[in-house]
């Protein structure tokens, strides 16, 4: 009885403080107009965005980048007025910043739906500020929106994840299984993340990808790294991903994922050879090539990797929000898809992603899982039976524990450079 009274009193205090804080939420952006293909005119990047199958709606918005210095933000998601509160902020070496936050619940209080105390991934905001531009991923009730600069304006994009490209080309089924250091934890799944590890990634974007995106590609890369790190925190992985370097390449894409990835990985074939010098100079453990191939989301060099094979290619439009950037690095650490889509037990029988598909109610999947048969959002979590989402374990100890895989292999990949 005493604890209930304290809880009610504390709840009333929190609610009162939240309502007061809400009055001071800074406007992040205001709607201007919904854009149509007729509005694209001579703007190729806008035309491409509007023609992308996964684009549900594009709205021009007026952004106040300075608002990201504030702890509470307010904005409109296609007619729905929402407020978000900051959970943390990070400074970037280039003077920019990353704003992490959560939406307020209808009662004006924050919700945390996971058993590990992390914020709800279905109601989250990550924003990268660079000068007067803001690039971000926004999830509201599981729905994905993207905020991004496009030419001399900003747009809010509503994404239909059911129409995203397939995760991989058929070549995925022939990927080599590369043994990594034998650091497997004894026994069944454990909650510990072990010794922390830092993995450094060099990101190279083709000029075609930069042109097709039409925004601040470096900010998109920083967003991909930030999302990856949030996923590691959410799932108790104990990895920090660092952006070792970002550069562009004039390499002309072949139109084939495997060909482009092979040329990116090879050190002396006359294609992108200089990136290996950059990799050594920046001490990057992993290399990721961002390309403009709309056929698929990505491809890694193997299930597992060595220092000479730790390379992946990612379609830029899948890199953030859909988490393909982290997904492909996950493959390089030996993580596999959900077991229904990817039944191989090599190198780890438990190393699969996880899909939750109840007969009724909310469906979801983790980072490495393919889409549900009836569609479901991809949450920024790795499968982990020790963590629950809305009371449901996010994995199975014997077959779906990507967290355990990443913990097993992180020291090996972090020592590649």
Swiss-Prot record:
SUPFAM superfamilies membership: Metalloproteases ('zincins'), catalytic domain
Residues annotated for Zn(2+) binding in this entry: 327, 331, 337
Free-text comment on the cofactor: Binds 1 zinc ion per subunit.
Family per record: Belongs to the peptidase M72 family.
GO molecular function: metal ion binding; metallopeptidase activity
Name of the protein in its database record: Peptidyl-Asp metalloendopeptidase
Keywords assigned: Hydrolase, Metal-binding, Metalloprotease, Protease, Signal, Zinc
Source organism per UniProt: Stenotrophomonas maltophilia (strain R551-3)
Active site: 328
EC number(s) from the headed UniProt entry: 3.4.24.33
Record's function text: Metalloprotease, specifically cleaves on the N-terminal side of aspartyl, glutamyl and cysteic acid residues.
Signal sequence annotation: 1-25
Keyword Zinc appears in the UniProt entry: yes
Catalytic activity, reaction form: Cleavage of Xaa-|-Asp, Xaa-|-Glu and Xaa-|-cysteic acid bonds
């Amino acid at each position: 009885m005493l604890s209930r009274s304290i809880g009610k009193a504390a709840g009333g205090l929190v609610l009162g403080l939240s309502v007061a804080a809400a009055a001071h939420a800074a406007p992040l952006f205001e709607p201007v107009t919904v854009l149509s293909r007729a509005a694209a005119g001579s703007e190729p990047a806008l035309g491409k965005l509007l023609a992308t199958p996964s684009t549900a709606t594009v709205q021009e918005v007026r952004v106040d980048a300075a608002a990201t210095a504030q702890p509470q933000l307010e904005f409109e998601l296609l007619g729905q007025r929402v407020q978000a509160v900051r959970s943390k902020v990070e400074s970037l070496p280039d003077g920019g910043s990353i704003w992490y936050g959560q939406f307020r619940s209808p009662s004006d209080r924050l919700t945390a739906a996971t058993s590990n105390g992390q914020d709800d991934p279905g109601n989250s905001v990550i924003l990268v500020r660079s000068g007067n531009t803001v690039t971000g991923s926004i999830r509201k009730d599981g729905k994905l929106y993207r905020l991004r600069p496009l030419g001399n304006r900003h747009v809010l994009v509503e994404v239909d994840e059911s129409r995203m490209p397939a995760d991989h080309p058929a070549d995925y089924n022939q990927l080599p299984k590369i043994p990594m250091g034998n650091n497997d934890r004894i026994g069944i799944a454990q909650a510990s993340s072990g010794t922390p590890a830092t993995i450094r990634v060099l990101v190279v974007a083709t000029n075609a990808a930069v042109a097709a995106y039409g925004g601040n590609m470096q900010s998109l890369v920083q967003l991909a790294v930030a999302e990856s790190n949030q996923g590691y925190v959410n799932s108790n992985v104990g990895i920090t991903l660092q952006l070792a370097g970002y550069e562009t390449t004039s390499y002309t894409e072949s139109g084939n994922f495997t060909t482009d990835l092979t040329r990116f990985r090879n050190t002396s074939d006359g294609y992108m050879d200089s990136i290996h010098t950059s990799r050594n100079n920046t001490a990057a453990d992993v290399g990721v090539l961002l390309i403009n191939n709309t056929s698929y989301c990505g491809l890694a060099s193997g299930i597992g990797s060595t220092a000479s094979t730790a390379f992946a290619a990612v379609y830029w439009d899948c890199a953030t929000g859909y988490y393909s950037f982290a997904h492909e690095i996950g493959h390089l650490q030996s993580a596999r898809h959900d077991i229904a889509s990817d039944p191989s037990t090599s190198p780890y029988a438990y190393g699969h992603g996880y899909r939750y598909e109840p007969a009724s109610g909310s469906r979801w999947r983790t980072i490495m899982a393919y889409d549900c048969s009836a569609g479901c959002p991809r949450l920024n979590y790795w499968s982990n039976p020790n963590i629950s989402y809305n009371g449901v374990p996010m994995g199975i100890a014997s077959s779906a524990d990507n967290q355990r895989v990443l913990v097993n292999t992180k020291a090996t990949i972090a020592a590649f450079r």
